[in-house]
Amino acid sequence: MTFKSGFVAILGRPNVGKSTFLNHVMGQXIAIMXDKAXTTRNKIMGIYTTDKEQIVFIDTPGIHKPKTALGDFMVESAYSTLREVDTVLFMVPADEARGKGDDMIIERLKAAKVPVILVVNKIDKVHPDQLLSQIDDFRNQMDFKEIVPISALQGNNVSRLVDILSENLDEGFQYFPSDQITDHPERFLVSEMVREKVLHLTREEIPHSVAVVVDSMKRDEETDKVHIRATIMVERDSQKGIIIGKGGAMLKKIGSMARRDIELMLGDKVFLETWVKVKKNWRDKKLDLADFGYNEREY
């Protein structure tokens, strides 16, 4: 039997559903999700393998006009995938008109000379007439290999999109073992799970000035638990107070919810300790960015 494989980038503006799509395809949380723009900061691989094929999806940070060194890193991280992949999924929302951000991405896609599939997400939010109008508008901007409307949240048409990708794969190697689902180490996934809970629980009170560093992660033979020490970094003292909460209640809730997700991922009992530290203006300091896991050479 011929084995087929390929690399597929998922590109688009912030908050269009790229991570939701990847998690649905993989059947579990690989990329964190929150209803805030620019939640994804690093490129994250989701490795989808069957007995006939391997599709390596690369979920990228939402492309936006950067205002900080972190923003520069995120946008360059997204565009750099164009040099690495066989196909691009350009994801746009069905419930928002084409904007300047979309046009900026389209110009880069035209120059990249990579086959592009337009994925119109969130079709569950619009009337079919609005969907057709959205598709026509984008169809006039560039030559797409395919146009596929989906609802990543509800799963509508997602399997059809995967089938289309499979049909267009070339014969190739199996790059990763069948049981590997991502390229990131467990520490990265743990830090992302803690960060997701911070964003979810603090809502609009904490902007994207939060990073999480896993200081240590090891099994305690006496308790038979994985002991994890993680530090939540913020830029201001006021943000530290919000995350800790009255009497430490918010930090306890963040830790409890994150621990449950980490236990599901690891298949182990976990003891999670969290601290909050202030590192002023870390998003504009390249040394801090590297320390907190935003390293161009790695991700």
Curated annotation (Swiss-Prot):
Keywords noted in UniProt: Cell membrane, Cytoplasm, GTP-binding, Membrane, Nucleotide-binding, Ribosome biogenesis, RNA-binding, rRNA-binding
Region annotated G1, chain positions: 12-19
Pfam families for this protein: KH_2 (PF07650), MMR_HSR1 (PF01926)
Location of the protein in the cell: Cytoplasm; Cell membrane
Positions of region (G3): 59-62
A single BP term in Gene Ontology: ribosomal small subunit assembly
Main subcellular location of this protein, as a coarse class: cytoplasm
Membrane topology label: Peripheral membrane protein
Limits of the KH type-2 domain: 202-280
PROSITE patterns membership: G_ERA (PS51713), KH_TYPE_2 (PS50823)
Xref: InterPro entries: G_ERA_dom, GTP-bd, GTPase_Era-like, KH_dom-like_a/b, KH_dom_type_2, KH_sf_prok-type, P-loop_NTPase, Small_GTP-bd
Era-type G domain residues: 4-171
Coiled-coil intervals, chain numbering: none
Gene3D superfamilies membership: 3.30.300.20, P-loop containing nucleotide triphosphate hydrolases
Record-listed GTP binding positions: 12-19, 59-63, 121-124
CDD domains: Era, KH-II_Era
Family: Belongs to the TRAFAC class TrmE-Era-EngA-EngB-Septin-like GTPase superfamily. Era GTPase family.
Function: An essential GTPase that binds both GDP and GTP, with rapid nucleotide exchange. Plays a role in 16S rRNA processing and 30S ribosomal subunit biogenesis and possibly also in cell cycle regulation and energy metabolism.
Subunit organization: Monomer.
Designated name of the protein: GTPase Era
Originating species: Streptococcus pneumoniae serotype 19F (strain G54)
Lineage: Bacteria, Bacillati, Bacillota, Bacilli, Lactobacillales
Protein's gene: era
